[in-house]
Amino acid sequence: MTKIYWNINLEEMMEAGVHFGHGTRKWNPKMAPYISAKRKGIHITNLTGTARFLSEACDLVFDAASRGKQFLIVGTKNKAADSVARASIRARCHYVNKKWLGGMLTNWSTTETRLHKFRDLRMEQKMGGLNRLPKRDATILKRQLARLQTYLGGMKYMTGLPDIAIIVDQHKEYTALQECITLGIPTICLIDTNCDPNLSDISIPANDDAISSIRFILNKLVFAICEGRSSYIINP
């Protein structure tokens, strides 16, 4: 795997609040190796370890992107949704940022059918076909299209299962994580001090509640993906 310097700065991580964990009463003992201190009832994450795991994750996604692999970024809580969409669009990744529908990956045939329906409705709307239908029929189809856009809008170009999944919040996205584990899809997961570091292929100890922390981690991963994609275009 290619090793590149990703300019992961500890001071910048502190400014982004990456090191702030949950309250000391709300923690998973498996996270003990990644916690450096307690401060005012809050666990503090060891940022040196975070930087190491983030660097490993960047190496992994760079290498995968340089070989044309596909990524899915999952983060559905309100604080993460906008950052997930922006990061995914920037790196041309698929994403889910509103709600994870059970079976999105493990029942791929159903998801694929929904995606085909979504694409057909989008094309119909673009060509003005919906406006030529009776008002009642058009209203029903437009409502279906709006719902599909909400839940599948970030996956509209997916034609198969992703090669790697990036998950922003282990607790919130537990169903998505379990589906990836079931299917053997490698996962990179942001884990706060209340998470289980053993569930993902690469776990990045970090504050998964603060927008600034989520954005910092995603920006590094997305930059690595973009660099990898550039390498793939130059040397296909």
From Swiss-Prot:
Main location: plastid
GO cellular component: chloroplast; mitochondrial small ribosomal subunit
PROSITE patterns: RIBOSOMAL_S2_1
Statement: the UniProt record of this protein carries the keyword Cell division: no
Single biological process term from Gene Ontology: translation
A molecular function (GO) term: structural constituent of ribosome
Subcellular location: Plastid, Chloroplast
Keyword annotations of the record: Chloroplast, Plastid, Ribonucleoprotein, Ribosomal protein
InterPro entries: Ribosomal_uS2, Ribosomal_uS2_bac/mit/plastid, Ribosomal_uS2_CS, Ribosomal_uS2_flav_dom_sf
Cited NCBIfam families: rpsB_bact
Family as reported in the entry's similarity comment: Belongs to the universal ribosomal protein uS2 family.
PANTHER family assigned to the protein according to its UniProt record, in alphabetical order: 30S RIBOSOMAL PROTEIN S2 PROKARYOTIC AND ORGANELLAR, SMALL RIBOSOMAL SUBUNIT PROTEIN US2M
Protein's UniProt name: Small ribosomal subunit protein uS2c
Gene: rps2
